[in-house]
């Protein structure tokens, strides 16, 4: 919950200051956030794959 409040506050501050600035600055920040999201997605997919393999090994070891 606290993260949501901080995120909303940061978004409002960016919106206020970005109102009169060029779009390039905001676009760069958006691309960085998008890249972080992509890395998070990829890491999650890899973690799920490793967990599934570990579960398969554990099931095979049990018989």
From Swiss-Prot:
Keywords, ordered alphabetically: Amidation, Antibiotic, Antimicrobial, Immunity, Innate immunity, Secreted, Signal
Keyword Signal (UniProt): yes
Chain positions found as Arginine amide: 62
Subcellular localization, as worded in the UniProt entry: Secreted
Keyword Secreted: yes
One GO cellular component term: extracellular space
Protein name (database record): Cecropin-1
Organism: Ceratitis capitata
């Amino acid at each position: 919950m606290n993260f949501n409040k901080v995120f909303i506050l940061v978004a409002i501050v960016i919106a206020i200051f970005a109102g009169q600035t060029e779009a390039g600055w905001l676009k760069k920040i958006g691309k960085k956030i998008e890249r972080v999201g992509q890395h998070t997605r990829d890491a999650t997919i890899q973690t799920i794959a490793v967990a599934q393999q570990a579960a398969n090994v554990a099931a095979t070891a049990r018989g």
